[in-house]
Design a protein with these regions (language model features):
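Bacterial Sec-dependent N-terminal signal peptides
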Residues: 1-56
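A short, N-terminal "cap"/entry segment at the start of jelly-roll beta-barrel domains
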Residues: 49-50, 61-129, 139
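Mid-length scaffold segments of soluble, non-membrane domains
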Residues: 109-173
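A short beta-strand-loop-beta hairpin characteristic of the jelly-roll/cupin
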Residues: 159-194
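Short, structured patches in soluble enzyme cores that scaffold and shape functional sites
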Residues: 165, 204, 227-229
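Conserved metal-binding segment of the jelly-roll/cupin
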Residues: 193-211
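A short hydrophobic beta-strand segment most commonly corresponding to one strand
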Residues: 199, 217-230
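Short proline/glycine-enriched turn/loop segments at secondary-structure junctions
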Residues: 212-216
Length: 230
């Protein structure tokens, strides 16, 4: 076979070099473009599934919850009544606000909180602190909310909190939008002990009856963080 020099002698052969280089460049660009498309599609799909707790298995939900990074270093334990999957779903919808909530609980000297509302992030997140005497079971009411989730923590003292599914209750007072509350009653109250060693989280599907006396009526110092979810 004849060499390129014999077919295209001298300067004519040299003119082919840019053409050959351009062909190589176009081929390389095509390869790079295809790789970019594959990478973008992979990145677009994988994180979406990874960050959608509604699609996680029960073991994946438990692993994420038990790891506890979402607590932002707050040492208090979550109560076993917390709906772990619902919390994972709500957390991943708005991690910034939930992180602010637990950072507040970790970094604030809670025993110094005065009664009333404490601003954190406007109507998206705020804390209500209160001091009250626990009430007898017969006068306690179950309540539920639609716009906010509650993080409830007894700073000092102890009480019981009834925890029941909203769907199982009988409504005794209709929902009042201005107060974001409705009231219900249940035959089975399912009381859980609440003390400084653990905290509770209640979502719209969770009816709860806080402030019920444990062994005796006592003064309780408590903080409730209101986290906007709807």
């Amino acid at each position: 076979m004849s060499s390129p020099e014999r077919i295209f002698p001298g300067k004519y052969y040299l003119c082919l070099e840019p053409v050959k280089s351009m062909l190589k460049t176009k081929k390389m660009k095509s390869v790079i473009f295809n790789l970019l498309i594959i990478t973008i599609m992979t990145c677009a799909c994988t994180p979406k599934n990874a960050q959608d707790p509604a699609k996680w298995s029960d073991s994946e939900v438990k692993s994420w919850f038990d790891k506890g990074e979402w607590k932002q270093g707050w040492a208090v334990a979550p109560d076993a009544s917390i709906d772990q999957r619902e919390f994972a779903i709500q957390y991943h919808k708005n991690p910034e606000v939930w992180n602010k909530a637990f950072t507040f609980l970790k970094s604030t000297p809670l025993d110094t909180l005065s009664k009333g509302r404490h601003e954190i992030d406007g109507d998206f997140l705020y804390a209500n602190a209160d001091q009250y005497t626990t009430k007898n079971e017969e006068v306690a009411k179950f309540e539920a909310h639609r716009k906010y989730a509650d993080i409830q923590y007894v700073i000092s003292g102890n009480e019981r909190i009834g925890v029941r599914p909203l769907a199982d209750g009988e409504i005794t007072e209709d929902y009042v939008d201005a107060k974001d509350v409705l009231f219900l009653k249940y035959a089975d109250k399912n009381y859980q002990a609440a003390d400084p060693g653990k905290f509770f989280i209640f979502f719209p599907a969770d009816a709860h009856s806080p402030g019920v006396k444990a062994d005796t009526n006592m003064v309780v110092h408590k903080v409730v963080l209101k986290v906007r979810i709807n």
